A protein has these predicted regions:
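Positively charged n-region of N-terminal signal peptides that target proteins for export
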Residues: 1-4
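N-terminal signal peptide c-region/cleavage motif recognized by signal peptidases
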Residues: 14-18
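A solvent-exposed, acidic/Ser-Thr-rich amphipathic alpha-helical stretch
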Residues: 116
Length: 333
């Protein structure tokens, strides 16, 4: 009888014990295919966060535009369809006028300088007021723009009359000053637009060549410091606020500057892969402007920066602060 009572008591204790709660699900929307180092960087971040959260949350990546693409990522994240999203700023550049400082021509020399300087502006509160609708976890700056074209470009004269794709306000203002016509396109539209002759050239970083197969529709690649495409990784405000403490601590630990640096390393890899692969291909030509011609290009687009300063709230201060941060990154290297 005593054994029976003990067994019944044991069963009662098991029944009364609380079940372990399932981890809170966090949907991370990724706009393109999972086939490059940048996605691997996002996956590495996801794995580190999940491990550190120890079951409190489970971040899951949804690549390939399943939840959102570059054109609607901002709305999907701020609207809560996705908890976290990565996308380029281009489609919503008007929402982030100060943050567009990272896209200006002839400022930072490379994506590392640009990304770290831009994140420093956010951390110091200089551009933070633009991020009220979601919580940024990192900024992404893609390797510097290269003009991928069907015909060679050696000078401003060669640009005259060309139709060139643009993303974002700054590039849209810059291209006409170089004598070409801007055509607004999303990254996923580049290949077919080149193939059909809707555009003659596309300014994109080297990683875009293998990602969008640009080598199949262009043969000439001009490296000129026309600025950078920038992007964000951000979490919905409500999703962030509702995270269990261990989940929030895990996300915070691996976000910010450390996440920016992780994505810089991914971009380094993609730039090398894209450029090296293109260089090795038959029929592909990589070129740079001579110093005198580059100076003419810089002079031609200088009004874009001047206009940006005038049109942007506190623009002069933001640009000066950005230049200070770029110089600080450069000096610390």
């Amino acid at each position: 009888m005593k054994k029976l009572l003990l067994a019944v008591a044991g069963l009662a204790m098991v029944a009364a014990a609380p079940a372990f709660a399932d981890p809170a699900q966090v949907k991370f929307a990724y706009p393109s295919a999972p086939n490059n180092a940048l996605f691997q960087g996002m996956q590495g971040w996801t794995d580190d966060v999940n491990k550190a959260a120890a079951g409190a949350i489970e971040v899951k990546l949804f690549p390939g535009g399943v939840i959102a693409d570059n054109s609607n990522m901002y709305d999907r994240v701020t609207g809560g369809v996705a908890d976290i999203g990565f996308a380029v700023f281009g489609p919503v550049s008007s929402v982030f006028p100060k943050t567009n400082v990272g896209t200006l021509p002839f400022e930072a020399r490379n994506h590392r300088e640009d990304a770290l300087a831009l994140w420093a502006l956010y951390e110091k509160g200089i551009i933070k007021d633009e991020f009220t609708k979601f919580h940024p976890l990192a900024f992404v700056v893609f390797p510097g723009l290269v003009i991928h074209s069907k015909k060679p470009i050696h000078s401003l004269a060669d640009m005259k009359g060309m139709k060139i794709s643009v993303e974002g306000r700054v590039l849209s203002q810059m291209i006409p000053r170089l004598g070409a016509a801007p055509i607004s396109l999303q990254p996923g539209e580049l290949y077919q637009s080149l193939q059909r002759g809707l555009v003659d050239a596309v300014p994109q970083g080297w990683p875009s060549v293998p990602t969008f197969h640009l080598d199949e529709v262009t043969n000439f690649h001009l490296e000129v410091p026309l600025g950078f495409n920038t992007g964000y990784v951000a979490i919905n405000n409500d999703s962030y606020a509702k995270l269990p403490p261990a989940g929030k601590a895990a996300i915070d630990k691996f976000s910010g500057k450390v996440f920016v640096e992780r994505l810089i390393a991914a971009d380094d890899t993609m730039q090398a892969v894209g450029r090296d692969a293109t260089k090795a291909m038959a029929g592909q030509t990589i070129a740079q402007l001579d110093p005198a011609e580059e100076a003419r290009w810089k002079e031609a687009v200088a009004p874009v920066t001047e206009e940006w300063v005038k049109a942007t709230p506190d623009g002069a201060h933001v640009l000066a602060a950005f230049r200070d941060e770029v110089n600080a990154v450069r000096a610390a290297k």
